[in-house]
Protein backbone atom coordinates (compact mmCIF):
# COMPACT_ATOMS: atom_id res chain seq x y z
CA UNK A 1 0.00 0.00 0.00
CA UNK A 2 1.40 3.40 -0.99
CA UNK A 3 1.25 6.12 1.64
CA UNK A 4 2.76 8.80 -0.65
CA UNK A 5 4.57 8.81 -3.99
CA UNK A 6 7.80 7.50 -2.50
CA UNK A 7 6.77 5.70 0.70
CA UNK A 8 4.92 2.44 1.23
CA UNK A 9 3.28 0.96 4.29
CA UNK A 10 5.65 -2.01 4.06
CA UNK A 11 8.69 0.29 4.19
CA UNK A 12 7.44 1.83 7.44
CA UNK A 13 6.43 -1.44 9.12
CA UNK A 14 9.06 -4.00 8.09
CA UNK A 15 11.18 -5.23 10.98
CA UNK A 16 13.81 -7.94 10.87
CA UNK A 17 13.46 -8.30 14.65
CA UNK A 18 9.71 -8.88 14.30
CA UNK A 19 10.26 -11.41 11.51
CA UNK A 20 12.95 -13.31 13.44
CA UNK A 21 10.77 -13.47 16.54
CA UNK A 22 7.41 -14.19 14.91
CA UNK A 23 5.90 -10.87 16.02
CA UNK A 24 2.93 -9.45 14.14
CA UNK A 25 3.85 -5.83 13.39
CA UNK A 26 0.64 -4.97 11.53
CA UNK A 27 -0.65 -1.48 12.33
CA UNK A 28 -4.31 -0.62 12.93
CA UNK A 29 -6.17 1.67 10.52
CA UNK A 30 -5.58 4.56 12.96
CA UNK A 31 -1.84 3.83 12.97
CA UNK A 32 -1.82 3.64 9.16
CA UNK A 33 -3.45 7.08 9.00
CA UNK A 34 -0.76 8.42 11.36
CA UNK A 35 1.96 6.92 9.14
CA UNK A 36 0.35 8.54 6.09
CA UNK A 37 0.36 11.94 7.84
CA UNK A 38 4.02 11.44 8.85
CA UNK A 39 4.91 10.69 5.24
CA UNK A 40 2.85 13.53 3.76
CA UNK A 41 4.12 16.18 6.17
CA UNK A 42 7.72 15.14 6.85
CA UNK A 43 9.20 12.23 4.90
CA UNK A 44 7.86 13.01 1.41
CA UNK A 45 8.81 16.71 1.63
CA UNK A 46 12.34 15.67 2.67
CA UNK A 47 12.50 13.24 -0.26
CA UNK A 48 11.52 16.06 -2.61
CA UNK A 49 13.76 18.70 -0.98
CA UNK A 50 16.88 16.54 -1.27
CA UNK A 51 15.84 14.56 -4.37
CA UNK A 52 17.37 11.51 -2.69
CA UNK A 53 15.85 8.40 -1.09
CA UNK A 54 15.45 8.22 2.67
CA UNK A 55 16.45 4.97 4.37
CA UNK A 56 13.95 4.28 7.13
CA UNK A 57 15.56 2.14 9.83
CA UNK A 58 12.50 2.10 12.09
CA UNK A 59 8.92 3.20 11.59
CA UNK A 60 5.85 1.66 13.19
CA UNK A 61 6.47 -0.69 16.13
CA UNK A 62 3.81 -2.83 17.76
CA UNK A 63 3.94 -2.71 21.55
CA UNK A 64 5.34 -6.24 21.60
CA UNK A 65 8.10 -5.28 19.15
CA UNK A 66 8.83 -2.10 21.11
CA UNK A 67 9.37 -4.14 24.25
CA UNK A 68 11.66 -6.55 22.46
CA UNK A 69 13.89 -3.79 21.04
CA UNK A 70 14.09 -1.99 24.39
CA UNK A 71 11.79 0.88 23.46
CA UNK A 72 8.97 2.23 25.60
CA UNK A 73 5.41 1.30 24.62
CA UNK A 74 4.62 5.02 24.92
CA UNK A 75 7.06 5.75 22.06
CA UNK A 76 5.52 7.60 19.12
CA UNK A 77 6.70 4.68 16.98
CA UNK A 78 3.90 2.63 18.58
CA UNK A 79 1.24 5.05 17.34
CA UNK A 80 2.69 5.34 13.84
CA UNK A 81 3.71 8.96 14.37
CA UNK A 82 7.51 8.52 14.25
CA UNK A 83 10.31 7.17 12.10
CA UNK A 84 14.10 6.91 12.33
CA UNK A 85 15.99 7.48 9.09
CA UNK A 86 19.07 8.69 7.24
CA UNK A 87 19.63 10.13 3.78
CA UNK A 88 22.78 8.43 2.46
CA UNK A 89 25.36 10.96 1.34
CA UNK A 90 23.81 13.86 3.29
CA UNK A 91 25.09 14.97 6.69
CA UNK A 92 22.45 14.22 9.33
CA UNK A 93 23.11 17.52 11.10
CA UNK A 94 22.22 19.36 7.88
CA UNK A 95 18.99 17.36 7.52
CA UNK A 96 18.16 17.92 11.20
CA UNK A 97 18.53 21.70 10.78
CA UNK A 98 16.41 21.61 7.62
CA UNK A 99 13.61 19.85 9.49
CA UNK A 100 13.78 22.32 12.40
CA UNK A 101 13.65 25.31 10.06
CA UNK A 102 11.15 24.10 7.45
CA UNK A 103 8.85 21.26 8.48
CA UNK A 104 5.89 21.03 10.90
CA UNK A 105 7.34 18.30 13.10
CA UNK A 106 6.25 17.39 16.59
CA UNK A 107 9.71 16.27 17.62
CA UNK A 108 13.05 15.78 15.90
CA UNK A 109 16.07 14.20 17.57
CA UNK A 110 19.59 14.05 16.14
CA UNK A 111 20.72 10.76 17.69
CA UNK A 112 24.33 9.73 18.38
CA UNK A 113 25.76 12.18 15.84
CA UNK A 114 29.49 12.70 15.42
CA UNK A 115 31.38 13.85 12.35
CA UNK A 116 32.87 10.36 12.04
CA UNK A 117 29.56 8.56 12.63
CA UNK A 118 26.49 10.34 11.36
CA UNK A 119 24.06 8.59 13.70
CA UNK A 120 20.42 8.94 12.62
CA UNK A 121 17.39 11.20 12.85
CA UNK A 122 14.21 10.44 14.80
CA UNK A 123 11.25 12.55 13.66
CA UNK A 124 7.59 12.56 14.62
CA UNK A 125 4.51 14.32 13.33
CA UNK A 126 1.18 15.13 14.93
CA UNK A 127 -1.07 18.01 13.88
CA UNK A 128 -0.13 21.18 15.77
CA UNK A 129 3.01 19.51 17.12
CA UNK A 130 5.39 20.82 19.76
CA UNK A 131 8.24 21.71 17.42
CA UNK A 132 10.68 20.14 19.88
CA UNK A 133 14.29 19.76 18.70
CA UNK A 134 16.73 17.63 20.72
CA UNK A 135 20.04 15.87 20.41
CA UNK A 136 20.78 12.53 22.06
CA UNK A 137 24.10 10.92 22.93
CA UNK A 138 25.38 8.42 25.48
CA UNK A 139 24.80 11.01 28.22
CA UNK A 140 21.15 11.62 27.33
CA UNK A 141 18.95 14.24 25.69
CA UNK A 142 19.75 17.92 25.24
CA UNK A 143 17.55 20.70 23.89
CA UNK A 144 18.83 22.03 20.57
Place the predicted regions along the sequence by residue.
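Extracytoplasmic cell-surface/polysaccharide-interacting catalytic and binding patches
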Residues: 1-47, 138-144
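A broad, low-specificity signal marking well-ordered, structured residues that form hydrophobic/aromatic
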Residues: 54, 83, 121
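Short connector loops at helix/strand junctions that flank enzyme active sites
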Residues: 49-51, 78-82
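Surface-exposed loop/turn and secondary-structure junction residues enriched for glycine/proline
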Residues: 12-15, 22, 26, 63, ...
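Extended, low-complexity, intrinsically disordered C-terminal regulatory tails
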Residues: 41-70
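Glycine-rich, flexible loop/turn motifs
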Residues: 3-5, 65, 74
Amino acid sequence: MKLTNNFSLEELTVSQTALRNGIDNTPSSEHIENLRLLCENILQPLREDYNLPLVVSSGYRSKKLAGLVGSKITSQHCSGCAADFTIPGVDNKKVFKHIVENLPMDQVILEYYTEENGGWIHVSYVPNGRGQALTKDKEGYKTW
